[in-house]
Regions:
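Multi-pass alpha-helical membrane architecture of UbiA-family
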Residues: 2-397
């Protein structure tokens, strides 16, 4: 049966029988402004799945880590900062879904179905509304917070969108991806900025100005914060190389230059990602060697055992769906590592509370399947070259 002779149906007539639908027609439905029939409750659940709260946990813990270098702030101010730290990752995930339709049709076909329940245009409107709310919350926390939030909203949304579309620029793409934890780390500081920045600048410029440097204890906190910022950047850039491997086939087909598609094969990309990931964790050692962190933080490197094992699993993975399962495990490992690091850097009750909250989000999302990189999404419900054609949606839908 040729594609043009396939039976036609509306999405209402199909119900849940999406296995009969061609991927090309589902993509056309989304691009044409249509969407699948769904209740409000289903759309809300789908929205949360597309926002992928489990992937926002490292950002939340990075916020807590950044906040631990400050003198503290009132609970309401801290709670708002933490909420905004979670929101920036959630918003970026939603935006990427709206812009990565072609890649997702190859890498995560099930995600196209989820997008079709929301609709591409409504999702973009929602992303813009969420960005406006985040900026309003950032303004309430002061000029520093608002400045970095503005950069985060623009920068992270340019990961998949023109004119920059940094995901197609290998090094820049990894650096922008790393900002998913770096900006929350900066939000932690800017929730209660104190004089950390002024102290750091004074310490750096004192020899040039011929002036006395700030007190050593004050300067040490600022230098520690800067060193941890550098470590988190390297760590999450390496995680970006890991994340790119499961998307190898779709990104290659779309002509997107990533750290993975620059390699000759998926396995070569996996080897590179595994090596860089192990090296990034080990880069915590120089922070202790130069006296910028206490020796106890090296206990967090016990996570190198599961990190290495998971890297080997990535190298052995034969296809995208199998690699996606490895990537999901990597998120648990990454969250566990930064939670351990937080508790070692700042062994306080507030840190424990943030770790408990992060664990609840991570494991709650898994329990309730509130994610759009599940095995079902990687394998998808579609038959790419055969099936039922979708008739265009009625006007006004």
């Amino acid at each position: 049966m040729s594609p043009n002779s396939l039976p036609a149906a509306t999405h209402e007539e199909l119900g849940d029988e999406l296995s009969a639908v061609r991927m090309s027609d589902m993509m056309a439905l989304v691009r044409g402004g249509g969407r699948l029939a769904a209740t409000r409750g289903e759309r809300l659940r789908t929205l949360i799945m597309l926002g992928r709260p489990r992937t926002c946990v490292p950002g939340l813990l990075a916020f807590a880590l950044g906040f631990s270098y400050t003198a503290g702030a009132p609970l309401a101010r801290t709670a708002l900062g933490a909420t905004l730290a979670l929101s920036i990752g959630f918003s970026a995930n939603l935006h990427n879904v709206a812009t990565d339709l072609y890649e997702d049709s190859r890498n995560l076909p099930g995600r196209v179905t989820l997008l079709a329940k929301i609709g591409a245009r409504p999702l973009i409107v929602l992303c813009r509304s969420l960005s406006a709310l985040m900026m309003a919350g950032a303004v309430a926390l002061g000029a520093y917070f608002a400045l970095f939030m503005g950069l985060a909203v623009v920068g992270l949304h340019q990961y998949s969108s023109p004119p920059v579309r940094s995901k197609g620029r290998p090094i820049l793409g990894l650096w922008v991806f790393a900002q998913a934890v770096v900006f929350p780390f900066l939000f932690g500081w800017t929730t209660a900025p104190g004089r950390m920045l002024e102290t750091l600048l004074a310490a750096m410029t004192a020899p040039l100005r011929g002036a006395a440097p700030p007190p050593a204890a004050e300067a040490w906190t600022s230098w520690r914060y800067l060193a941890m910022w550098f470590f988190l950047t390297l760590w999450f850039m390496a995680k970006g190389t890991f994340k790119n491997v499961p998307d190898y086939d779709g990104d290659l087909a779309a002509g997107i230059r990533t750290s993975a598609t620059l390699c000759k094969s998926r396995r070569s990309a996996a080897r590179l990602a595994a090596a860089l990931t192990v090296a990034s964790y080990a880069s915590l050692v120089p922070l202790v060697a130069f006296g910028l962190e206490r020796p106890r933080v090296l206990v967090a490197l016990a996570w190198l055992v599961p990190v290495t094992a998971n890297g080997l699993r990535l190298v052995r993975a034969e296809d995208g769906p199998t690699s996606n399962a490895v990537l999901r495990a990597d998120m648990v490992i990454s969250s566990g590592f930064i939670a351990t690091l937080l508790l070692l850097v700042a062994p306080r009750l507030e840190s424990v509370a943030m770790v408990v909250l992060g664990a609840a989000i991570l494991f709650g999302s898994d329990l309730l399947e509130l994610d759009s990189r599940r095995d079902a999404d990687a394998r998808g419900p579609f038959a790419p070259d055969s099936g039922v054609q979708l008739r265009p949606p009625p006007r006004g839908m």
